[in-house]
Amino acid sequence: MSTHVAGLGLDKMKLGNPQSFLDQEEADDQQLLEPEAWKTYTERRNALREFLTSDLSPHLLKRHHARMQLLRKCSYYIEVLPKHLALGDQNPLVLPSALFQLIDPWKFQRMKKVGTAQTKIQLLLLGDLLEQLDHGRAELDALLRSPDPRPFLADWALVERRLADVSAVMDSFLTMMVPGRLHVKHRLVSDVSATKIPHIWLMLSTKMPVVFDRKASAAHQDWARLRWFVTIQPATSEQYELRFRLLDPRTQQECAQCGVIPVAACTFDVRNLLPNRSYKFTIKRAETSTLVYEPWRDSLTLHTKPEPLEGPALSHSV
């Protein structure tokens, strides 16, 4: 989106019949304004309406809020890439996996902490920018609904400045939606005597959250079947970590009804559960050395079925 909104291209706009945009209050205002002032008023008002229905529409803001909620559930990783790969070169001279052999482990751990901090700050800034967009739209929409013509005439410069500010916020928000490069102040490779070392870039990457399939997951009498999925399937298979625990254990022995299960698939059956009890399950990716931030994991509570009733046999008298 361009941040240039001065004039809003009003001299190039081909407006239809202005009367089609008028409500009764606007019709009353038309009687009070000179024809030239009225023309300027309607053109600027229509330009603002166009901005609020296209560049900053409620539907668009709703989509941004949904994307923001998704980003808060994603997992964030640090990627080590030679500069030519980070810039999009598809013919690697040095594979990323080989770079880890050259990197100082202690320095890499420090950079992971930097990646964690940068990710947290980025998410906080995105939330703040989205609030500014909500506030800016509400403010501009109130101007559009107001019968007062002054903001569109004598005070139009202030409105244009506000439009430019909101457009700049939108540009910053869209740019920050994509995780970027980590800023490295020092060399990650300690052994400078090694053969020619490529210029290394550290990038932040995002993985979509792991979510339980609530329709396919179910509890039976003494076992439960759990299924989960990732919105965008990874190119390679992933390892997961399934946790479970009994809610409200009543004895010391029942406190042992919990566990952590490594799983290499997207489904697993948890056995030896107690009947007629509630269990909480959580799912996440297995932790790797490149994970820097994972603020959320999906959880699901299931209730096992009770044991069948076993009563005395019924006798029938003739």
UniProtKB/Swiss-Prot annotation:
Residues 210-307 form the Fibronectin type-III domain. SUPFAM superfamilies: Fibronectin type III. PROSITE patterns: FN3. It comes from the Eukaryota. Signal peptide: none annotated. PANTHER family: FIBRONECTIN TYPE III DOMAIN-CONTAINING PROTEIN 11 (PTHR14537). This is Fibronectin type III domain-containing protein 11. It comes from Homo sapiens (Human). The gene is FNDC11.
